[in-house]
Structure formats: C-alpha cells, structure tokens
C-alpha cells in the first residue's frame, strides 16, 4: 500500500446488484447517506480518476476502463475490481448509450438498471420476453441516465418504473 492509499477516504459500502450497470451503481453510491457526494466528479476526485466517473454515469465507455481505473475505484468503494468490471459492457459488445432502456418487469423484481439492456442489439428482455422500454409508458418522457434514478419513477409524471410493466409489450 502506498502513501496515497493510506490518506484516500473510504466511502460507505453499497452492495452492487447482480447485472447492475455502472451508471446505476455509481448513482446509488453517491446518494448513499454516509457518502452524500453531490456529483460524479466529486466521486472521481476521491478515487483519483477525475471526470471519468461522469462519463461512466452517462454510459460513455470510449475508451474502455483500464484495470488501473477499476482498481482505483475499487479502493474507495470496497468492491473488487473484477466485480466492478462486470458492471461495464463486455469487451467486444457494442453499447448504445441513448436511449436509456428499461425492462419494467425486471425492475419490479430488482430495482436496478442492467447493463445488458443498453447493448446495441438488445431490443427485448430475454428473461420476460418483453420489448424494452425507452420512455415512460404514461407521458412518453425518455428515461434519464440510470445514475439519476433517485425516486424509481418517471421524473415527469411520477409513474413508478415497476408499474410500467403492465403496458410493456410482448416481443
């Protein structure tokens, strides 16, 4: 352990969900009461990564995270670097950062955004055989980035994400 590691603050621990996207995880981590970090940049500053965490929250991964970046983040969030790597797109997979996609049926079971939904070729939830949503089923507002899913609902009409499953179409 070097000198920088000894003075670097450790954040309150937030357990990652299975299949969770890095954007959703970083948003939950920042909002966790023990952390209360106002921005992605503030998290990046603590981890010694600067603005790169802001790109990750917006689902921009070009260039793909390096092992050193993952290890730097792992030091402050107490999550193994290999586990963090699972929250990013697999090497060779093309990700489409917009529109943000959601399977409301999955979200009702586990309230998190899954990285697999953002894969370019992914149009349906394999688990539920439902078409992925790209906007609110009530007001048609596009979904914000997963890091900003604070209330688990549409920020415009307040329909809970989980309730959108009723209007999600079979694929």
Predicted regions: what they are:
Residues 1-99, 104, 111:
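A structured, charge-rich N-terminal accessory region that forms the first stable segment of a protein
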Residues 49-53, 126, 148-149:
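Short amphipathic alpha-helical patches
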Residues 90-93, 109-116, 120-126:
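Catalytic micro-motifs at enzyme active sites that drive phosphoryl/nucleotidyl and oxygen chemistry
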Residues 93, 123-127, 145, 156-159:
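Solvent-exposed, non-transmembrane amphipathic alpha-helical segments
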Residues 96-102, 118-121, 129-133, 150-153:
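Short metal-coordination and nucleic-acid-contact micro-motifs, chiefly zinc-binding Cys/His arrays
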Residues 104-108, 124-127, 138, 156:
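Short, cysteine/histidine-rich loop/knuckle motifs that typically chelate Zn2+
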Residues 107-110, 129, 143, 147:
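Short, flexible loop/turn elements at secondary-structure junctions
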Residues 134-171:
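Domain-exit/linker segments immediately C-terminal to small folded modules
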């Amino acid at each position: 352990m070097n000198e920088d590691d000894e003075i670097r603050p450790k954040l309150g621990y937030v357990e990652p969900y299975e299949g969770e996207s890095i954007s959703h995880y970083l948003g939950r981590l920042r909002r966790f009461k023990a952390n209360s970090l106002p921005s992605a940049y503030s998290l990046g500053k603590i981890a010694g990564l600067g603005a790169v965490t802001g790109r990750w929250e917006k689902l921009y991964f070009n260039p793909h995270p390096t092992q050193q970046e993952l290890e730097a983040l792992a030091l402050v969030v107490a999550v193994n670097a290999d586990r963090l790597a699972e929250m990013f797109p697999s090497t060779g997979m093309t990700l489409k950062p917009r529109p943000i996609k959601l399977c409301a049926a999955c979200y009702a079971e586990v309230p998190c955004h899954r990285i697999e939904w953002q894969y370019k070729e992914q149009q349906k939830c394999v688990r539920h055989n439902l078409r992925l949503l790209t906007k609110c089923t009530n007001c048609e507002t596009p979904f914000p980035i997963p890091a900003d899913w604070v209330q688990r609902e549409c920020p415009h009409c307040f329909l809970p994400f989980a309730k959108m499953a009723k209007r999600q179409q079979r694929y």
